[in-house]
Amino acid sequence: MTQMEEAKRGVITEEMKKIAKIEKIDPEKLRRSVAKGHTVIFRNVNHDWVVPVAVGQGVRVKVNANIGTSRDIVNVEEEIEKAKIAVKYGADTIMDLSTGGDLDFIRRKIMKAVNVPVGTVPIYQAAEEMLARGKAIIEMTEDDMWKAVEKHFKDGVDFVTIHAGVTKEVVEKLKRVNRVVGMVSRGGTFLAAWILHWGEENPFYKNYEYLLELAKEYDVVLSLGDGLRPGGLPDAGDELQIAELYTIGRLVKRAREFGVQTMVEGPGHVPIDQIPTHIRLMKIASDNAPVYVLGPIVTDIFPGYDHISAAIGGAIAALNGADFLCYVTPAEHLGLPTIEHVKEGVIATKIAAHAVNLTRFEEDFKIDYQMSLARGKLNWKEQFKIAFDKEKFIEIRKERPTKSEACSMCGDLCAIKIVREMLGHKARS
């Protein structure tokens, strides 16, 4: 039975108990939320060593880090190190988006390297295998697509992005809608091109019940991908995005009836003032399914700094109901990220998630409160102990030292130091 089916029967599973203990929440509330489909639990039945993670209502906003090879750069050890660094700096999950090299080997190595849930996009493997055989992506058969999905499920992948909402009807609209950027989802584009070439319906939509059967067998969470997401600010909220969203909403309902867990993927580029509306619309269309957003990026003119843009958008999205933030690195739109880029991307997105979590969970706020106390006392040892990135803390302190008990920005002109000394002087008087 899936986590959702057990929850509907009134059973609090071992995974729910573990999550409730980690999150310090009521396990019964978690069970009810999972039963409704408002919260999902990542834990493939074949992924024995994973620490289960919950995403959705009543739990903390989570962070995902994408890693993986490309056709240009295949360095498996580097990708494994990226996964470890991502987890070290706060990623709750990893997605392996590899498109170069031995994809089965890479995926399995990454899964063994970390104990967090791992997600994938199986259509990438189906497409890559076509290219490896000297064929065009559109030559892949429905069987090729399903084999990739089943292989990932059997390997223990906890959640997968499936672009079931890229239907033949929506693709027909693509011909007449004048988009500035077009389609930017790789998986969505592979399927759209396949549909246009063969004139057939998306296999994941046409045979959605078969997908549900597979997902149910392994208790894999279906992350219903936004193949028509906006790839630039001018395309945000257009009819293609909204048409796909409502199709996804209907697919969520069918999955719940089947006892399969689902979440909904959200837009990538959205003007900052439109983010609350986008998130609310996603929640309405999906009857409060967990929302998984990439960013969203709030401005398009800062390549090299898109991790900052995404953190701004992610904080606003999470405050308005987004449950799961996919990180963006400084390399976004420019190239394959390095290990350092991964670290920077995770920390930026972790800031966004924590900024929202501390407004909802007393325990999270207490950490910031303790830091405020330490700063008020100029207690550098305690500040170091609490600091999220201790390496950065030490690096800057060593780089710019001071003889005063304050920092080298103010030294003896430190406001905290002056007020403390004055108050201490008056008290002695």
Curated annotation (Swiss-Prot):
Gene Ontology biological process: thiamine biosynthetic process; thiamine diphosphate biosynthetic process
Catalytically driven reaction(s): 5-amino-1-(5-phospho-beta-D-ribosyl)imidazole + S-adenosyl-L-methionine = 4-amino-2-methyl-5-(phosphooxymethyl)pyrimidine + CO + 5'-deoxyadenosine + formate + L-methionine + 3 H(+)
A Pfam family per the record: ThiC_Rad_SAM
Residue sites binding [4Fe-4S] cluster per the record: 407, 410, 414
Entry cofactors: [4Fe-4S] cluster
E.C. number(s) listed in UniProt: 4.1.99.17
Name of the protein in question: Phosphomethylpyrimidine synthase
Organism superkingdom: Archaea
Annotated Zn(2+) binding sites: 269, 333
Keywords: 4Fe-4S, Iron, Iron-sulfur, Lyase, Metal-binding, S-adenosyl-L-methionine, Thiamine biosynthesis, Zinc
Annotated cofactor note: Binds 1 [4Fe-4S] cluster per subunit. The cluster is coordinated with 3 cysteines and an exchangeable S-adenosyl-L-methionine.
Pathway: Cofactor biosynthesis; thiamine diphosphate biosynthesis
UniProt cross-references to Gene3D superfamilies, sorted A to Z: Radical SAM ThiC family, central domain
GO molecular function: 4 iron, 4 sulfur cluster binding; carbon-carbon lyase activity; zinc ion binding
Family from the record: Belongs to the ThiC family.
Parts forming coiled coils: none
